[in-house]
Structures are given as C-alpha cells and as structure tokens.
C-alpha cells in the first residue's frame, strides 16, 4: 500500500464518520485568520480572482471564498474521495476535484492558492511548492498555507505514531527558507489562533 493511499484511507474514514465536520470546527479560527489576510489583499487589488484550495476536505473554506463578490472561480482538490463526495453535496457553484495531490496538475492557473493542514502529509512538499510557484500561481498571486504539525509545536510530535501516518516536520525558519528558495517574495509567517496552551497554527505565505 502506497504512502499517499494510506493517508487517503484515514481521511476517507473521517469523512464517512462525520469527523470532517469536527475538523471544520477545529480549524475554523485559524483558517479565518488566513482568509482574512488573503481576502483583504484581494479586496485592495480590487480585481476578480481565482482560488484553489489544496486538501479542501468537505469544501467549507472553498465555499466561503466562493461567496466573495470578487471571486470568479473557486476549486477545491482532495485525495480522499469521500471528502470530495461530501464537498459536492454542499456545492454552491464552486468546483471540486478528486485527485492524488502528490501528482495533481491543474490545467488552469490561480491568483490565490490556499492550503490548511495538508503539505506535511507529502513525502516531498518542496517539490509540490516548486510546481505551484512555477506552473499554478499567477504573477502577483499568493500562496498561503497553515500547519499544526511543525517542530515548535511539541504537542504535535506524537501525531505520526498516533495516526500511523508518516508526516514531514520542519522548523518554522526551515519552512520560510523553503518558500524563499522557490522564488516567492515577501515571505512571512505567524501563529494563528495561538493561546496560552496551544502553540497555534503556523501560517506561511508569500507572493509570486
């Protein structure tokens, strides 16, 4: 059984059991911060934009962005078929794709590419980020992603063993340097939804 197949199995089980709704609730505050940052920028630009959500789950973030007046195209992609089934059942007008995210190759480009809790499931996230920057992201577009699994969040260190899934861990500065190495500009990071007992979601973003 391949590595990505194992990850898909876990998320299919979560979608079938309704755990995707819990994930939506648990990630809502961090994703709201991320989208507020990205959508404020799009509003200031004042032009219509396209949106891609990598690892979209049941599509809740994709739907929220689709509702934005300036959004003219929203696409959500996930490797778990049952997540995509759930997303399509709630579709407003956005589009959902079931695909292996390690090899996914869209034929269209986007102004805003967003991902929450996905990239560390890849064996080689740097390769994907290079493809995003070189082929998927429009000039002037933004890549933004959020991670709860990172070195400084010690609470997350046990997750690979708990879920029996390999995960790719880096320090915050290593993620920043990785994005800079792809050619992204103005790379910044922050901790979203940080509390006294939670290290927060690590958000990394840069523009093309």
Spans of model-derived segments:
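Short, glycine-/aromatic-enriched active-site segment of Class I SAM-dependent methyltransferases
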Residues: 148-166
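Conserved class I S-adenosyl-L-methionine
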Residues: 1-43, 64, 151
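Conserved beta-strand signature within the Rossmann-like core of class I S-adenosyl-L-methionine
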Residues: 140-148
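Class I SAM-dependent methyltransferase SAM/SAH-binding core
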Residues: 52-103
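Conserved S-adenosyl-L-methionine
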Residues: 184-195
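A short glycine-rich, Lys/Arg-flanked "PGG" loop and its adjoining helix->strand segment in the class I
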Residues: 126-139
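A conserved beta-strand element that flanks and buttresses the S-adenosyl-L-methionine
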Residues: 114
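Short alpha-helix
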Residues: 167-182
């Amino acid at each position: 059984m391949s590595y990505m197949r194992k990850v898909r199995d876990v998320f299919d089980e979560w979608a079938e059991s309704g755990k995707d709704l819990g994930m939506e609730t648990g990630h809502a505050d961090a994703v709201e911060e991320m989208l507020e940052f990205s959508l404020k920028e799009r509003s200031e630009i004042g032009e219509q934009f396209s949106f891609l959500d990598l690892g979209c789950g049941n599509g809740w973030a994709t739907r929220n962005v689709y509702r934005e007046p300036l959004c003219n195209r929203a696409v959500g992609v996930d490797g778990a078929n049952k997540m995509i089934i759930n997303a399509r059942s709630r579709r407003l007008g956005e589009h959902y794709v079931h695909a292996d995210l390690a090899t996914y190759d869209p034929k269209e480009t986007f102004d805003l590419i967003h991902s929450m809790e996905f990239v560390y499931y890849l064996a080689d996230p740097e390769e994907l980020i290079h493809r995003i920057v070189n082929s998927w992201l429009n000039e002037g577009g933004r890549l933004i992603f959020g991670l709860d699994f990172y070195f400084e969040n010690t609470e997350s260190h046990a997750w690979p063993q708990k879920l029996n899934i390999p995960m790719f861990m880096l320090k915050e500065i290593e993620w920043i340097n990785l994005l800079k190495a792809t050619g992204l500009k103005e790379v910044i990071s922050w901790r979203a939804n940080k509390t006294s007992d939670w290290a927060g979601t690590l958000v990394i973003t840069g523009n093309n």
